Design a protein with these regions (language model features):
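Short, glycine-biased loop/turn motifs at secondary-structure junctions and
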Residues: 1-161
Length: 161
């Protein structure tokens, strides 16, 4: 039985950086040796990590749930704390995630994942409140102020409480 790894991949209007188009429910294959950062269908196990490679502030960015299989190369960047990133010879596009699904997934992650997500994905005011209500730590408020509201002084402000 073939190992399948579920993960997430970002596209620009369902096109990759080479302008290849992808469709929901279809499987794709690439020949040749698979190596992360070189060749293969790249995806991340953790949703927040896709924003290392795609701009989540761009309204054309689409986030998909995918399955990678076939030949798989795993990459971990311990220095920056990115783990379980893959390149695979085969990929299936399961579905496009709605904003609600993205928030539902990310809200159940740890605080470091939330910080990474806030720094890479444009949130609505309602989504900011959902995150602030779940994570009441001051650092989350600072991340939202800095990355979402462009407040360059967010990390130097003294809070009154």
């Amino acid at each position: 039985m073939m190992n399948k790894i579920k993960g997430y991949k970002a596209y620009n209007n369902m096109n990759d950086r080479f302008n290849n188009s992808y469709e929901i429910g279809k499987e794709y294959y690439i020949e040749g040796p698979i190596k992360f950062k070189e060749r293969g269908f790249h995806f991340c196990k953790n949703l927040e990590d896709v924003f290392r490679y795609y701009n989540g502030f761009d309204e054309n960015t689409v986030i998909c749930e995918v399955e990678g299989f076939g030949e798989i190369d795993t990459y971990n960047d311990e220095y920056y704390g990115y783990y379980d990133m893959y390149a695979s010879s085969n990929i299936k596009i399961i579905k496009v995630l709605s904003r609600e699904e993205i928030i539902d997934i990310i809200i159940n992650r740890n605080i470091d994942s939330i910080k990474r997500f806030i720094s890479g994905f444009k949130l609505t005011e309602e989504e900011e409140l959902i995150i602030l209500n779940k994570f009441k730590e001051e650092i989350i408020e600072k991340y939202i102020d800095y990355y979402q509201k462009n407040d360059e002084k967010a990390f130097t402000k003294k809070r009154s409480w």
